[in-house]
Amino acid sequence: MPQQTITTNNRKSINRGKDIAKDTILTPNFYTTDFEAMEKMDLSINEEELEAICEEFRKDYNRHHFVRNKEFEGAADKLDPETRELFVDFLEGSCTSEFSGFLLYKELSKRIKDKNPLLAECFAHMARDEARHAGFLNKSMNDFGLQLDLGFLTANKDYTYFAPRAIFYATYISEKIGYWRYIAIFRHLEKNPGGKIFPLFNFFENWCQDENRHGDFFDALMKAQPRTVKSLSHKFEIFGYTFKHPIFDYYHRFRYFLNNHPIVSKLWSRFFLLAVFATMYIRDLGTKKDFYGALGLNAREYDQFVINKTNETSARVFPVVLNVYDESFYKRLDKIVENGTLLSAIDKRNNSNLIKVISKLPIFISNGYQLIRLYLLKPLESNDFQPSIR
Protein backbone atom coordinates (compact mmCIF):
# COMPACT_ATOMS: atom_id res chain seq x y z
CA MET A 1 0.00 0.00 0.00
CA PRO A 2 1.51 3.38 -0.93
CA GLN A 3 2.36 5.97 1.69
CA GLN A 4 -0.50 8.46 2.14
CA THR A 5 0.55 11.62 3.91
CA ILE A 6 -1.92 14.38 4.70
CA THR A 7 -0.60 17.84 5.42
CA THR A 8 -2.79 20.26 7.34
CA ASN A 9 -1.55 23.56 8.76
CA ASN A 10 2.06 22.45 8.33
CA ARG A 11 1.44 19.28 10.31
CA LYS A 12 1.66 15.79 8.84
CA SER A 13 -0.74 13.05 9.82
CA ILE A 14 1.33 9.92 9.46
CA ASN A 15 0.56 6.20 9.27
CA ARG A 16 -2.24 6.27 6.70
CA GLY A 17 -0.18 3.73 4.81
CA LYS A 18 3.09 3.43 6.58
CA ASP A 19 1.95 1.15 9.41
CA ILE A 20 0.07 -1.23 7.17
CA ALA A 21 2.78 -1.40 4.54
CA LYS A 22 5.64 -1.92 6.94
CA ASP A 23 4.13 -4.20 9.57
CA THR A 24 6.63 -6.78 10.77
CA ILE A 25 6.96 -9.08 13.77
CA LEU A 26 8.89 -6.26 15.47
CA THR A 27 6.20 -3.57 15.14
CA PRO A 28 3.51 -3.00 17.79
CA ASN A 29 0.50 -5.23 17.14
CA PHE A 30 -3.20 -4.82 17.88
CA TYR A 31 -4.94 -7.67 19.68
CA THR A 32 -8.37 -9.14 20.26
CA THR A 33 -9.47 -12.11 22.36
CA ASP A 34 -12.36 -14.36 23.43
CA PHE A 35 -14.61 -11.87 25.22
CA GLU A 36 -17.17 -14.54 26.15
CA ALA A 37 -14.54 -16.55 28.00
CA MET A 38 -13.28 -13.41 29.74
CA GLU A 39 -16.69 -12.48 31.08
CA LYS A 40 -17.11 -15.98 32.54
CA MET A 41 -13.90 -15.85 34.54
CA ASP A 42 -14.18 -16.87 38.16
CA LEU A 43 -12.08 -14.48 40.26
CA SER A 44 -13.08 -15.89 43.64
CA ILE A 45 -9.74 -17.61 44.25
CA ASN A 46 -7.93 -14.27 44.33
CA GLU A 47 -10.73 -11.70 44.43
CA GLU A 48 -9.38 -9.92 47.52
CA GLU A 49 -6.07 -9.07 45.85
CA LEU A 50 -7.81 -8.01 42.63
CA GLU A 51 -10.12 -5.71 44.59
CA ALA A 52 -7.09 -4.17 46.33
CA ILE A 53 -5.41 -3.53 42.98
CA CYS A 54 -8.62 -2.04 41.60
CA GLU A 55 -8.68 0.33 44.57
CA GLU A 56 -5.15 1.40 43.64
CA PHE A 57 -6.36 2.07 40.10
CA ARG A 58 -9.23 4.20 41.43
CA LYS A 59 -6.79 6.49 43.22
CA ASP A 60 -5.25 7.37 39.83
CA TYR A 61 -1.90 8.49 41.24
CA ASN A 62 -0.75 9.97 37.92
CA ARG A 63 -3.91 11.98 37.25
CA HIS A 64 -2.00 15.28 37.35
CA HIS A 65 1.42 13.97 36.31
CA PHE A 66 1.26 14.17 32.52
CA VAL A 67 1.17 17.96 32.23
CA ARG A 68 3.55 19.59 29.78
CA ASN A 69 5.73 22.45 30.99
CA LYS A 70 7.93 25.15 29.48
CA GLU A 71 10.77 22.69 28.91
CA PHE A 72 8.93 21.39 25.85
CA GLU A 73 8.95 24.82 24.17
CA GLY A 74 11.52 24.74 21.37
CA ALA A 75 13.00 21.42 22.55
CA ALA A 76 12.32 19.77 19.19
CA ASP A 77 14.26 22.46 17.33
CA LYS A 78 17.41 21.72 19.34
CA LEU A 79 17.82 18.21 17.93
CA ASP A 80 20.07 17.56 14.96
CA PRO A 81 18.36 15.90 11.95
CA GLU A 82 19.69 12.40 12.68
CA THR A 83 18.69 12.44 16.37
CA ARG A 84 15.38 14.01 15.43
CA GLU A 85 14.57 11.14 13.07
CA LEU A 86 15.56 8.52 15.67
CA PHE A 87 13.43 10.15 18.36
CA VAL A 88 10.38 10.55 16.13
CA ASP A 89 10.61 6.86 15.27
CA PHE A 90 10.70 6.09 19.01
CA LEU A 91 7.65 8.30 19.60
CA GLU A 92 5.71 6.69 16.78
CA GLY A 93 6.38 3.13 17.96
CA SER A 94 5.70 3.97 21.61
CA CYS A 95 2.46 5.81 20.83
CA THR A 96 1.20 2.95 18.66
CA SER A 97 2.05 0.44 21.40
CA GLU A 98 0.25 2.43 24.11
CA PHE A 99 -2.76 2.94 21.85
CA SER A 100 -2.86 -0.78 21.12
CA GLY A 101 -3.11 -1.44 24.86
CA PHE A 102 -5.86 1.16 25.18
CA LEU A 103 -7.98 -0.46 22.46
CA LEU A 104 -7.69 -3.94 23.97
CA TYR A 105 -8.42 -2.83 27.55
CA LYS A 106 -11.26 -0.53 26.49
CA GLU A 107 -12.97 -3.22 24.44
CA LEU A 108 -12.61 -5.72 27.27
CA SER A 109 -14.11 -3.30 29.79
CA LYS A 110 -17.12 -2.69 27.52
CA ARG A 111 -17.77 -6.33 26.63
CA ILE A 112 -17.63 -7.86 30.13
CA LYS A 113 -19.00 -5.08 32.36
CA ASP A 114 -22.42 -6.70 32.85
CA LYS A 115 -21.23 -10.17 33.88
CA ASN A 116 -17.81 -9.46 35.39
CA PRO A 117 -17.89 -5.90 36.78
CA LEU A 118 -14.70 -6.06 38.88
CA LEU A 119 -12.62 -7.27 35.96
CA ALA A 120 -14.27 -4.73 33.67
CA GLU A 121 -13.49 -1.87 36.03
CA CYS A 122 -9.82 -2.87 36.23
CA PHE A 123 -9.58 -2.94 32.44
CA ALA A 124 -11.31 0.45 32.23
CA HIS A 125 -8.74 2.01 34.57
CA MET A 126 -5.88 0.52 32.58
CA ALA A 127 -7.44 1.79 29.34
CA ARG A 128 -7.50 5.26 30.93
CA ASP A 129 -3.77 5.02 31.67
CA GLU A 130 -2.86 3.76 28.20
CA ALA A 131 -4.94 6.49 26.53
CA ARG A 132 -3.21 9.10 28.68
CA HIS A 133 0.22 7.76 27.70
CA ALA A 134 -0.66 7.65 23.99
CA GLY A 135 -2.06 11.18 24.10
CA PHE A 136 1.03 12.51 25.85
CA LEU A 137 3.30 10.88 23.29
CA ASN A 138 1.18 12.23 20.43
CA LYS A 139 1.56 15.74 21.85
CA SER A 140 5.33 15.29 21.70
CA MET A 141 4.96 14.26 18.06
CA ASN A 142 3.12 17.54 17.50
CA ASP A 143 6.31 19.32 18.54
CA PHE A 144 7.92 17.81 15.44
CA GLY A 145 5.06 18.78 13.14
CA LEU A 146 3.61 15.27 13.17
CA GLN A 147 0.54 13.56 14.51
CA LEU A 148 -0.26 9.86 14.63
CA ASP A 149 -3.60 9.14 12.96
CA LEU A 150 -5.06 7.03 15.75
CA GLY A 151 -8.51 6.89 14.17
CA PHE A 152 -7.09 5.44 10.98
CA LEU A 153 -5.06 2.92 12.95
CA THR A 154 -8.18 1.78 14.81
CA ALA A 155 -10.08 1.13 11.59
CA ASN A 156 -7.34 -0.29 9.39
CA LYS A 157 -4.75 -2.05 11.55
CA ASP A 158 -4.90 -5.84 11.46
CA TYR A 159 -5.93 -7.41 14.77
CA THR A 160 -4.24 -10.58 16.03
CA TYR A 161 -6.39 -13.02 18.00
CA PHE A 162 -4.95 -14.39 21.24
CA ALA A 163 -6.78 -16.66 23.67
CA PRO A 164 -7.26 -15.06 27.13
CA ARG A 165 -4.54 -17.21 28.67
CA ALA A 166 -2.06 -16.02 26.03
CA ILE A 167 -3.14 -12.42 26.59
CA PHE A 168 -2.37 -12.80 30.30
CA TYR A 169 1.12 -14.17 29.71
CA ALA A 170 2.11 -11.75 26.96
CA THR A 171 0.62 -8.63 28.54
CA TYR A 172 2.05 -9.35 31.99
CA ILE A 173 5.55 -9.62 30.50
CA SER A 174 5.02 -6.55 28.29
CA GLU A 175 3.87 -4.40 31.22
CA LYS A 176 6.72 -5.53 33.47
CA ILE A 177 9.31 -5.13 30.74
CA GLY A 178 7.88 -1.66 30.10
CA TYR A 179 8.47 -0.81 33.76
CA TRP A 180 12.11 -1.89 33.64
CA ARG A 181 12.71 -0.14 30.30
CA TYR A 182 11.35 3.20 31.53
CA ILE A 183 12.98 3.14 34.96
CA ALA A 184 16.35 2.12 33.50
CA ILE A 185 16.27 5.05 31.05
CA PHE A 186 15.14 7.46 33.76
CA ARG A 187 17.89 6.42 36.18
CA HIS A 188 20.53 6.57 33.46
CA LEU A 189 19.51 10.09 32.39
CA GLU A 190 19.31 11.17 36.03
CA LYS A 191 23.01 10.35 36.32
CA ASN A 192 23.85 11.50 32.78
CA PRO A 193 21.66 14.55 32.04
CA GLY A 194 23.63 15.26 28.88
CA GLY A 195 21.83 12.37 27.21
CA LYS A 196 18.37 13.80 27.93
CA ILE A 197 17.54 14.79 24.37
CA PHE A 198 13.91 15.68 25.14
CA PRO A 199 11.93 16.61 28.30
CA LEU A 200 9.60 13.63 27.78
CA PHE A 201 12.09 11.48 29.71
CA ASN A 202 11.50 13.52 32.89
CA PHE A 203 8.10 11.80 33.14
CA PHE A 204 9.39 8.23 32.97
CA GLU A 205 9.71 7.63 36.72
CA ASN A 206 5.98 8.04 37.42
CA TRP A 207 5.09 6.65 34.02
CA CYS A 208 6.77 3.33 34.78
CA GLN A 209 4.66 2.96 37.92
CA ASP A 210 1.55 2.72 35.72
CA GLU A 211 3.23 -0.13 33.83
CA ASN A 212 4.15 -1.80 37.12
CA ARG A 213 0.60 -1.62 38.47
CA HIS A 214 -0.76 -3.05 35.23
CA GLY A 215 1.68 -5.94 35.52
CA ASP A 216 0.62 -6.52 39.14
CA PHE A 217 -2.98 -6.74 37.96
CA PHE A 218 -2.17 -9.51 35.48
CA ASP A 219 -0.11 -11.21 38.18
CA ALA A 220 -3.18 -11.28 40.44
CA LEU A 221 -5.42 -12.34 37.56
CA MET A 222 -3.20 -15.32 36.75
CA LYS A 223 -3.21 -16.31 40.42
CA ALA A 224 -6.98 -16.58 40.09
CA GLN A 225 -6.29 -19.51 37.78
CA PRO A 226 -6.43 -22.38 36.96
CA ARG A 227 -10.21 -22.56 36.83
CA THR A 228 -11.01 -19.41 34.90
CA VAL A 229 -14.23 -20.35 33.14
CA LYS A 230 -17.41 -20.91 35.15
CA SER A 231 -19.10 -23.05 32.51
CA LEU A 232 -17.92 -24.87 29.43
CA SER A 233 -19.42 -24.60 25.98
CA HIS A 234 -21.28 -27.02 23.73
CA LYS A 235 -20.08 -24.99 20.75
CA PHE A 236 -17.16 -25.68 18.45
CA GLU A 237 -16.02 -23.03 15.97
CA ILE A 238 -13.78 -23.62 12.97
CA PHE A 239 -13.22 -21.60 9.80
CA GLY A 240 -16.00 -19.21 10.76
CA TYR A 241 -18.59 -21.98 11.22
CA THR A 242 -20.17 -22.81 14.59
CA PHE A 243 -21.28 -26.34 15.48
CA LYS A 244 -23.36 -27.17 18.55
CA HIS A 245 -23.50 -30.54 20.27
CA PRO A 246 -23.08 -31.77 23.88
CA ILE A 247 -20.09 -33.85 22.79
CA PHE A 248 -18.07 -30.66 22.32
CA ASP A 249 -18.35 -30.12 26.06
CA TYR A 250 -15.89 -33.00 26.53
CA TYR A 251 -13.54 -31.45 23.99
CA HIS A 252 -13.50 -28.19 25.93
CA ARG A 253 -13.04 -30.01 29.22
CA PHE A 254 -10.02 -31.85 27.81
CA ARG A 255 -8.63 -28.62 26.36
CA TYR A 256 -8.95 -26.77 29.67
CA PHE A 257 -7.41 -29.75 31.48
CA LEU A 258 -4.38 -29.53 29.21
CA ASN A 259 -4.16 -25.75 29.52
CA ASN A 260 -4.21 -25.98 33.30
CA HIS A 261 -1.66 -28.79 33.60
CA PRO A 262 1.57 -27.64 35.33
CA ILE A 263 3.74 -28.87 32.46
CA VAL A 264 1.72 -26.83 29.95
CA SER A 265 2.04 -23.73 32.14
CA LYS A 266 5.81 -24.16 32.17
CA LEU A 267 5.95 -24.51 28.40
CA TRP A 268 3.81 -21.39 27.88
CA SER A 269 5.90 -19.42 30.38
CA ARG A 270 9.09 -20.23 28.50
CA PHE A 271 7.48 -19.51 25.14
CA PHE A 272 6.17 -16.04 25.99
CA LEU A 273 9.26 -14.97 27.91
CA LEU A 274 11.45 -15.94 24.97
CA ALA A 275 9.10 -14.35 22.42
CA VAL A 276 9.04 -10.99 24.21
CA PHE A 277 12.74 -10.97 25.12
CA ALA A 278 13.91 -12.01 21.65
CA THR A 279 11.66 -9.49 19.89
CA MET A 280 12.94 -6.62 22.03
CA TYR A 281 16.59 -7.65 21.75
CA ILE A 282 16.50 -8.09 17.97
CA ARG A 283 14.69 -4.77 17.49
CA ASP A 284 16.81 -2.72 19.87
CA LEU A 285 20.17 -4.03 18.65
CA GLY A 286 19.04 -3.91 15.05
CA THR A 287 16.95 -0.91 14.09
CA LYS A 288 16.92 1.01 17.42
CA LYS A 289 20.59 0.81 18.39
CA ASP A 290 21.41 4.38 17.34
CA PHE A 291 18.49 5.77 19.36
CA TYR A 292 19.86 4.35 22.59
CA GLY A 293 23.29 5.60 21.59
CA ALA A 294 21.83 9.12 21.37
CA LEU A 295 20.77 8.75 25.02
CA GLY A 296 24.27 7.63 25.97
CA LEU A 297 23.15 4.04 26.49
CA ASN A 298 24.81 0.88 25.25
CA ALA A 299 21.85 -0.93 23.65
CA ARG A 300 23.23 -4.40 24.40
CA GLU A 301 23.94 -3.68 28.07
CA TYR A 302 20.60 -1.89 28.45
CA ASP A 303 18.59 -4.74 26.95
CA GLN A 304 20.40 -7.38 28.96
CA PHE A 305 19.72 -5.46 32.17
CA VAL A 306 16.02 -5.10 31.29
CA ILE A 307 15.69 -8.77 30.30
CA ASN A 308 17.43 -10.00 33.45
CA LYS A 309 15.24 -7.84 35.70
CA THR A 310 12.02 -8.79 33.92
CA ASN A 311 12.99 -12.45 34.11
CA GLU A 312 13.51 -12.11 37.88
CA THR A 313 10.19 -10.32 38.30
CA SER A 314 8.37 -12.98 36.27
CA ALA A 315 9.48 -15.63 38.78
CA ARG A 316 6.82 -14.21 41.10
CA VAL A 317 4.03 -15.61 38.95
CA PHE A 318 5.44 -18.06 36.38
CA PRO A 319 6.43 -21.59 37.49
CA VAL A 320 9.69 -21.36 35.53
CA VAL A 321 11.75 -18.58 33.95
CA LEU A 322 14.51 -18.55 31.36
CA ASN A 323 18.11 -19.24 32.26
CA VAL A 324 19.39 -15.92 30.94
CA TYR A 325 22.62 -16.50 32.86
CA ASP A 326 23.69 -19.39 30.66
CA GLU A 327 26.57 -18.16 28.48
CA SER A 328 24.82 -19.37 25.34
CA PHE A 329 21.64 -17.32 25.92
CA TYR A 330 22.83 -13.92 24.71
CA LYS A 331 25.29 -15.45 22.24
CA ARG A 332 22.39 -17.02 20.38
CA LEU A 333 20.38 -13.79 20.46
CA ASP A 334 23.44 -11.93 19.13
CA LYS A 335 23.66 -14.46 16.30
CA ILE A 336 20.07 -13.65 15.32
CA VAL A 337 20.92 -9.93 15.38
CA GLU A 338 23.90 -10.61 13.08
CA ASN A 339 21.62 -12.57 10.78
CA GLY A 340 19.30 -9.57 10.67
CA THR A 341 22.14 -7.49 9.26
CA LEU A 342 22.72 -10.12 6.58
CA LEU A 343 19.03 -10.13 5.67
CA SER A 344 19.04 -6.34 5.32
CA ALA A 345 22.07 -6.54 3.04
CA ILE A 346 20.30 -9.08 0.82
CA ASP A 347 17.26 -6.79 0.55
CA LYS A 348 19.48 -4.01 -0.79
CA ARG A 349 20.87 -6.12 -3.64
CA ASN A 350 19.57 -5.67 -7.17
CA ASN A 351 18.57 -9.31 -7.47
CA SER A 352 15.23 -10.84 -8.34
CA ASN A 353 12.84 -11.71 -5.53
CA LEU A 354 13.44 -15.41 -6.14
CA ILE A 355 17.21 -15.03 -5.72
CA LYS A 356 16.67 -13.00 -2.57
CA VAL A 357 14.39 -15.66 -1.08
CA ILE A 358 16.89 -18.41 -1.86
CA SER A 359 19.71 -16.32 -0.36
CA LYS A 360 17.69 -15.70 2.81
CA LEU A 361 16.63 -19.31 3.34
CA PRO A 362 19.81 -20.48 5.16
CA ILE A 363 19.61 -17.40 7.40
CA PHE A 364 15.98 -18.10 8.28
CA ILE A 365 16.94 -21.69 9.11
CA SER A 366 19.77 -20.39 11.30
CA ASN A 367 17.38 -18.06 13.15
CA GLY A 368 14.92 -20.89 13.68
CA TYR A 369 17.68 -23.13 15.00
CA GLN A 370 18.88 -20.48 17.46
CA LEU A 371 15.34 -19.88 18.76
CA ILE A 372 14.69 -23.60 19.18
CA ARG A 373 17.94 -24.02 21.12
CA LEU A 374 17.01 -21.06 23.31
CA TYR A 375 13.58 -22.52 23.99
CA LEU A 376 15.03 -25.93 24.85
CA LEU A 377 17.59 -24.43 27.23
CA LYS A 378 16.85 -25.84 30.68
CA PRO A 379 14.76 -23.24 32.54
CA LEU A 380 15.10 -22.11 36.13
CA GLU A 381 12.47 -23.29 38.58
CA SER A 382 10.97 -20.16 40.11
CA ASN A 383 10.75 -21.68 43.59
CA ASP A 384 14.50 -22.28 43.56
CA PHE A 385 15.34 -19.12 41.66
CA GLN A 386 13.62 -16.59 43.94
CA PRO A 387 12.17 -18.33 47.00
CA SER A 388 12.16 -15.12 49.03
CA ILE A 389 9.59 -13.38 46.82
CA ARG A 390 7.34 -16.41 46.38
From Swiss-Prot:
It is an enzyme of class 1 (oxidoreductase). Pfam families: Rubrerythrin. InterPro entries: AcsF (IPR008434), Ferritin-like_SF (IPR009078), Rr_diiron-bd_dom (IPR003251). Pathway: Porphyrin-containing compound metabolism; chlorophyll biosynthesis (light-independent). Its cofactor is Fe cation. It catalyses: Mg-protoporphyrin IX 13-monomethyl ester + 3 NADPH + 3 O2 + 2 H(+) = 3,8-divinyl protochlorophyllide a + 3 NADP(+) + 5 H2O. GO terms for molecular function: iron ion binding; magnesium-protoporphyrin IX monomethyl ester (oxidative) cyclase activity. SUPFAM superfamilies: Ferritin-like. Its EC number is 1.14.13.81. Keywords: Chlorophyll biosynthesis, Iron, Metal-binding, NADP, Oxidoreductase, Photosynthesis. One of its GO terms (biological process) is photosynthesis. Belongs to the AcsF family. Catalyzes the formation of the isocyclic ring in chlorophyll biosynthesis. Mediates the cyclase reaction, which results in the formation of divinylprotochlorophyllide (Pchlide) characteristic of all chlorophylls from magnesium-protoporphyrin IX 13-monomethyl ester (MgPMME). This is Magnesium-protoporphyrin IX monomethyl ester [oxidative] cyclase. The gene is acsF.
